From Swiss-Prot:
GO terms for molecular function: L-methionine-(S)-S-oxide reductase activity; peptide-methionine (S)-S-oxide reductase activity. Signal peptide: none annotated. Its EC number is 1.8.4.11. The keyword Plastid does not apply. This is Peptide methionine sulfoxide reductase MsrA. One of its GO terms (cellular component) is cytoplasm. NCBIfam families: msrA (TIGR00401). The lineage of its organism: Bacteria, Pseudomonadati, Pseudomonadota, Alphaproteobacteria, Hyphomicrobiales. Gene3D superfamilies: Peptide methionine sulphoxide reductase MsrA (3.30.1060.10). It catalyses: L-methionyl-[protein] + [thioredoxin]-disulfide + H2O = L-methionyl-(S)-S-oxide-[protein] + [thioredoxin]-dithiol; [thioredoxin]-disulfide + L-methionine + H2O = L-methionine (S)-S-oxide + [thioredoxin]-dithiol. Has an important function as a repair enzyme for proteins that have been inactivated by oxidation. Catalyzes the reversible oxidation-reduction of methionine sulfoxide in proteins to methionine.
Length: 221
């Protein structure tokens, strides 16, 4: 990743890069399971976006969950610039976050399990950074369009916040909101650590377990 760009505040409207009207080329199929990266996905498949630092390691966390995960992809969301490049996102002038798109079957992969994986795989108290990766594109974020799923996400945040406070951590800084447009990242980023097993992964959790199941219920149950 690009360590030398470390913008730690969101850009002002007059700083936003213009982007482009056409999507960037990306991979057509998932490198691990061979499924098409882009929708439309099969009936019953839901999607959520997770930002937890560098998306290379974050994506691997989710595809490794196995059954119930239809496909994963990395991209940019929660910003302003249309169809940004990776280099543009790293300037901090697009407003985007590096995120993982997870398309999953809630009958086989409860949303709770995705939430637990999300919270336990990073430190959600660090603001505009994850470890050595500093910048607005590394902020903790959870993006779902469905209001019920958003309520589940907020309940899980509150439960995990209590667990973190008990261990001496500060408040959670995760943003939970509607995703807005999702832009697929360039092909070389997709399933990066499957193609490059020794590649960089800056992901690291707090070691605090997320008490999913306390006031957080899966709608499919």
């Amino acid at each position: 990743m690009l360590f030398f760009r470390k913008r730690a505040e969101m850009p002002a409207p007059d700083q936003i890069l213009p982007g482009r009207p056409t999507p960037l080329p990306t991979a057509e199929r998932h490198f691990v399971n061979g499924r098409p990266l882009k929708g439309p996905y099969p009936e019953g498949i839901e999607t959520a976006l997770f930002g937890l630092g560098c998306f290379w390691g974050a994506e691997r966390k989710f595809w490794q969950l196995g059954d119930g995960i239809w496909v994963t992809a990395v991209g940019y969301a929660a910003g302003t610039t249309p169809n940004p490049t990776y280099e543009e996102v790293c300037t901090g002038l697009t407003g985007h976050n590096e995120v993982v798109l997870v398309a999953y079957d809630p009958a086989a992969m409860p949303f709770e399990r995705l939430l637990k994986t999300f919270w336990e795989s990073h430190d959600p108290t660090q603001g505009m950074r994850q470890g050595n990766d500093v910048g607005t594109q590394y902020r903790s974020g959870l993006y779902v369009a469905d209001a019920e799923r958003r309520a589940q996400a907020e309940a899980s945040r509150d439960a995990y916040g209590e667990a973190l406070r008990a261990k001496g951590y500060g408040p959670i800084t995760t943003e939970i909101r509607d995703p807005g447009p999702f832009y697929f990242a360039e092909a070389y980023h997709q399933q990066y650590l499957a193609k490059n097993p020794a590649g960089y992964c800056g992901l690291g959790g707090t070691g605090v377990a997320c008490p999913i199941g306390t006031g957080v219920r899966n709608a499919a149950e």
